[in-house]
């Protein structure tokens, strides 16, 4: 039976309904500080921990719950410990509801100082949580307001929390404190080793980096059917990220490893555009990208950029999907569609395709969203900041050929350049205003990627422009582009043979812009 609960929370979401329900059931509530005041102000019967322990808070609240009566009450195993607990003057505590000081939010506050951050390292909270989690054979510990209703439902039914739920909650509690300690370690190890610590002078890559992940769901399989797989959600994932996407399909096949990797690649690319846009992806590479006056028009154009490759593809859209777009989408066999949202009548159309997976992200992260990216190598991770640049690099670039690009060519180069960033290197994108016409991806030689892009484009290559994710090492790329009627090029520049490359462009009357930025993708 739950007779006594200790409640001490920084996040007060759902606090009052929880406490009122417990009080109605005759549960004695112990509490501290701001939580105690919130309960008392709301008329919920509450006993301060000071009264329970007989010891006042000291050191400006640094020491409140670090007391044998508190931890003895939590850790006591039952009759075997009754005598010891009685000698301490304590009583059994059956339920601990505790979440921790907002360390992560404090670190992110503009202008925060090192002493402020240190004061937001919780000590008493993790100690109580770990004590309760260790003793989950008797005690229920709740660190997430999302679990309040389930815990209350069990108490309503049987007067206690089941052993299976206590074990699940204890597992979650240890993950909670582990992630918290990881954040503290990450912060401290990012500070300069010499001199006074300063929150404003932190290193981007701390010495110790802890990743807090929670399994969201199993996958149908891994990259291949003989490999198992699961999807893990990152703690604190940003709103609008794939990790928080809602599945809205008709209940057909589950997502696979490849589906998620492709969906992520497509959604990353579609974020580049502010006007209605569609991206079609196969094996993480865009095969067609377009913008338009509507999603329906944008998708139709993107699909037709490479209709053969679009079959069985992944589509990302950057607006709420309406019925008109849905009706065009179902014309082609697709694996997945991802978008911020869908209208009810769009869902009605899309759900006629039983095995079409639909994901709604609820928001669209900006193209320049900053975060770290990770890639596993044998025994470790390589970590870098996300490649968030591309916008403005063409218009802000340097014209190096005799002929400057026209406004129409600049518009096409800008689109091609944004897309090129999302194509596996060596990457070549041919574009006209509002759409790609040919993409060459992942080749070991750049000229081969040019050849593939021109082959994909066919006659559409004539009059198109070319974007290259890295410099041209030889003029052969420009010569081949000229043979296919390409009129302008955007590339980073920086080759030892830049002069020869520019001369080849001038000989063919091709406009050329050096962006000064490379966008390798591996």
UniProtKB/Swiss-Prot annotation:
It catalyses: (6R)-10-formyltetrahydrofolate + 5-amino-1-(5-phospho-beta-D-ribosyl)imidazole-4-carboxamide = 5-formamido-1-(5-phospho-D-ribosyl)imidazole-4-carboxamide + (6S)-5,6,7,8-tetrahydrofolate; IMP + H2O = 5-formamido-1-(5-phospho-D-ribosyl)imidazole-4-carboxamide. Pathway: Purine metabolism; IMP biosynthesis via de novo pathway; 5-formamido-1-(5-phospho-D-ribosyl)imidazole-4-carboxamide from 5-amino-1-(5-phospho-D-ribosyl)imidazole-4-carboxamide (10-formyl THF route): step 1/1; Purine metabolism; IMP biosynthesis via de novo pathway; IMP from 5-formamido-1-(5-phospho-D-ribosyl)imidazole-4-carboxamide: step 1/1. The keyword Cytoplasm does not apply. Signal peptide: none annotated. The keyword Plastid does not apply. GO terms for biological process: 'de novo' IMP biosynthetic process. InterPro entries: AICAR_Tfase_dup_dom_sf, Cytidine_deaminase-like, MGS-like_dom, MGS-like_dom_sf, PurH-like. One of its GO terms (molecular function) is IMP cyclohydrolase activity. One of its GO terms (cellular component) is cytosol. SMART domains: AICARFT_IMPCHas, MGS. Keywords: Hydrolase, Multifunctional enzyme, Purine biosynthesis, Transferase. Transmembrane segments: none annotated. It comes from the Bacteria. Pfam families: AICARFT_IMPCHas (PF01808), MGS (PF02142). PROSITE patterns: MGS. Gene3D superfamilies: 3.40.140.20, Methylglyoxal synthase-like domain (3.40.50.1380). Its EC number is 2.1.2.3, 3.5.4.10. Residues 1-143 form the MGS-like domain. The IMP cyclohydrolase activity resides in the N-terminal region. Belongs to the PurH family. This is Bifunctional purine biosynthesis protein PurH. It comes from Sorangium cellulosum (strain So ce56). The gene is purH.
């Amino acid at each position: 039976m739950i007779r006594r609960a200790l409640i001490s929370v920084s996040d007060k979401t759902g606090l009052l309904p929880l406490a009122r329900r417990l009080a109605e059931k005759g549960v004695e509530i112990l509490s501290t500080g701001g939580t105690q005041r919130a309960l008392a102000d709301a008329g919920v019967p509450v006993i301060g921990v000071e009264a329970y322990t007989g010891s006042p808070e000291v050191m400006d609240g640094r020491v409140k719950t670090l007391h044998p009566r508190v931890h003895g009450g939590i850790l006591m195993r039952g009759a075997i410990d009754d005598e010891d607990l009685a000698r301490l003057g304590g009583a059994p505590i059956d339920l601990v509801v505790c979440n921790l000081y907002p360390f992560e939010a404090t670190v992110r506050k503009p202008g925060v100082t090192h002493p402020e951050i240190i004061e937001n390292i919780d000590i008493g909270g993790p100690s109580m949580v770990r004590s309760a989690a260790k003793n989950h054979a008797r005690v229920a510990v709740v660190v997430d307001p999302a679990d309040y209703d389930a815990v209350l439902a069990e108490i309503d039914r049987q007067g206690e929390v089941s052993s299976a739920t206590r074990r699940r909650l204890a597992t979650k509690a240890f993950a909670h404190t582990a992630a918290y300690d990881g954040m503290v370690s990450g912060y401290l190890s990012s500070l300069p080793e010499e001199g006074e610590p300063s929150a404003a002078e932190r290193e981007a890559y701390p010495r110790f980096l802890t990743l807090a992940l929670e399994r969201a769901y199993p996958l149908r399989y891994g990259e291949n059917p003989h490999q198992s797989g699961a999807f893990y959600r990152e703690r604190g994932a940003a709103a609008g990220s794939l990790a928080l996407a809602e599945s809205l399909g008709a209940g057909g096949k589950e997502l696979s490893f490849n589906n998620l990797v492709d969906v992520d690649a497509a959604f990353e690319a579609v974020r580049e555009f502010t006007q209605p846009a569609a991206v079609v992806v196969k094996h993480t590479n865009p095969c067609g990208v377009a913008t338009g006056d509507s999603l329906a028009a944008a998708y139709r154009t993107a699909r037709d950029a490479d209709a053969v490759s679009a079959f069985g593809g992944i589509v990302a859209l950057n607006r709420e999907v309406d019925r008109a777009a849905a009706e065009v989408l179902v014309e082609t066999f697709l694996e997945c569609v991802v978008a911020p949202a869908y209208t009810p009548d769009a869902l009605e159309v899309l759900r006629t395709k039983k095995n079409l997976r639909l994901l709604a992200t609820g928001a669209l992260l900006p193209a320049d969203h900053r975060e770290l990216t990770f890639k596993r190598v044998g025994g470790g991770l390589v970590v870098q900041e996300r490649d968030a640049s591309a916008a403005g690099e063409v218009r802000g670039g340097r014209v190096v050929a005799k002929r400057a690009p026209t406004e129409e060519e600049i518009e096409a180069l800008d689109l091609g350049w944004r897309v090129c960033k999302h194509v596996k290197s060596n990457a070549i994108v041919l574009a006209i205003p509002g759409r790609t016409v040919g993409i060459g991806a992942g080749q070991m030689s750049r000229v081969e990627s040019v050849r593939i892009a021109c082959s994909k484009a066919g006659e559409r290559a004539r009059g198109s422009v070319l974007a290259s994710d890295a410099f041209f090492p030889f003029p052969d790329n420009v010569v081949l582009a000229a043979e296919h009627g390409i009129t302008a090029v955007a590339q980073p520049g920086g080759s030892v043979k830049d002069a020869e490359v520019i001369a080849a462009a001038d000989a063919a009357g091709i406009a050329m812009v050096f962006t000064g930025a490379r966008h390798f993708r591996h």
